[in-house]
């Protein structure tokens, strides 16, 4: 009897130094622990660009745009050329190129995609 290969889900392990720091802070001050946790939960994690996103990274027209309302600069990706445009928006700790499979399908359908790296995400500067 052969076993079916199960798909392995992605799990982000909490680094031990973070766990040790949180445990130490909890022992001395719940207020400090709360501030530490808030900082962790409001700081995006920057991930290395995977190979599957390299094509979009290379083929898109990239520009930096200043958003005066929040006084932050973001990187914008224009992928393909068409009068029909679709805006793609990534999630927390994401980047504009991570929706490349969707962007490629839209490109085949005759659309140009516009995506961006939110502040402190991908190539955009900053931290929260």
For the regions a protein language model found, what residue spans apply to each?
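Catalytic active-site module of serine/aspartate enzymes centered on a nucleophile-bearing elbow/loop
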Residues: 2-7
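An N-terminal hydrophobic leader/cap segment in hydrolases
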Residues: 8-66
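A short loop-to-beta-strand scaffold at the N-terminal edge of the catalytic core in hydrolase folds
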Residues: 61-79
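Glycine-rich adenosyl-nucleotide cofactor-binding module
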Residues: 81-85, 107
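Active-site glycine-rich loops that stabilize anionic/oxyanionic intermediates
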Residues: 82-83, 91-94
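Structural cue for short, hydrophobic secondary-structure segments
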Residues: 88-91, 115
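Conserved alpha/beta-hydrolase
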Residues: 96, 103-125
